[in-house]
């Protein structure tokens, strides 16, 4: 990927956002590589202006809430992991679900009992069977979950739209809206309530564009990390301070 992109990027000015974007968008897929390059070039441009990236991005607020991801595992292990994060000040937990939905529900119940003041939401990673999704969302709503991320497979477009129309729990779009093009489709179909932006794959340029699109349609938004280093997570976190990031 770099071998292809390097000669096409060399010679462009760091502030030539249209030129850089054209080069990166002409290279299909490879979202992680393009996101990293886009962010690095924004960083280079900021420093060429004598500023840091956070100054160029002009944060709209000074505090954001963080969420801690609880993986799929034994209940006691997950609870111990949650205790560690809760002790560090975390009050929002993202609970991975999908391998054993009955066990997932029991784990959510134990978490709610152990941390009644914490907010929980589930990330199903497209794992719920369409015919069972409503039943699980109703059960999770009773347990006090805030919302559910990607409950159904992305290709189940009609089922996703129908589930969102039922209004059981707010739905988060992640893999269904990986690019601005994807997001426009999902907005037209009205399949979600909250957009999960991943700067690791959308860089700064596409993250800002997608955030603006979501805001225009009255959608909420959050910023998530994805297999990043601490430095990458820091750069992603900078975008969480943008206007329109509500969750």
Residue ranges and their predicted role:
Residues 92-94, 149, 172, 196, ...:
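Conserved beta-strand positions in the central sheet of alpha/beta enzyme cores
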Residues 5, 37, 50, 93, ...:
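Conserved, mostly hydrophobic/aromatic
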Residues 5, 144, 155-170, 177-247:
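Shared catalytic-loop signature of beta/alpha-barrel
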Residues 7-14, 29, 113-116, 142, ...:
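Generic secondary-structure signature for well-ordered alpha-helical cores
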Residues 1-49:
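Metal- or metallocofactor-binding catalytic centers and their adjacent structured scaffolds
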């Amino acid at each position: 990927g770099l071998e292809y992109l390097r000669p096409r990027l060399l010679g462009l000015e760091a502030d030539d956002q249209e030129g850089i974007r054209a080069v990166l968008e002409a290279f299909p897929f490879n979202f992680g590589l393009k996101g990293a390059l886009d962010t690095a070039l924004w960083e280079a441009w900021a420093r060429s202006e004598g500023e840091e990236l956070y100054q160029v991005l002009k944060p709209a607020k000074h505090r954001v809430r963080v969420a801690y991801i609880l993986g799929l595992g034994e209940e006691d292990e997950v609870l111990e992991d949650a205790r560690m994060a809760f002790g560090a000040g975390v009050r929002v937990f993202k609970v991975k679900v999908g391998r054993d939905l009955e066990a997932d529900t029991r784990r959510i119940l134990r978490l709610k009992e152990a941390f009644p003041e914490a907010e929980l939401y589930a990330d199903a990673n497209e794992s719920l069977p369409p015919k069972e999704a409503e039943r699980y969302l109703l059960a999770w709503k009773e347990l006090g979950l805030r919302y559910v991320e990607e409950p159904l497979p992305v290709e189940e477009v009609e089922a996703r739209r129908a589930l969102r129309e039922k209004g059981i729990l707010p739905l988060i779009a992640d893999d269904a809206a990986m690019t601005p093009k994807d997001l426009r489709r999902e907005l037209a179909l009205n399949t979600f309530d909250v957009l999960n932006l991943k700067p690791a794959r959308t860089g700064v340029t596409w993250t800002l564009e997608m955030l603006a699109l979501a805001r225009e349609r009255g959608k909420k938004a959050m910023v998530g990390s994805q297999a990043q280093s601490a430095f990458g997570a820091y750069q992603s976190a900078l975008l969480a301070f943008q206007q329109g990031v509500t969750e």
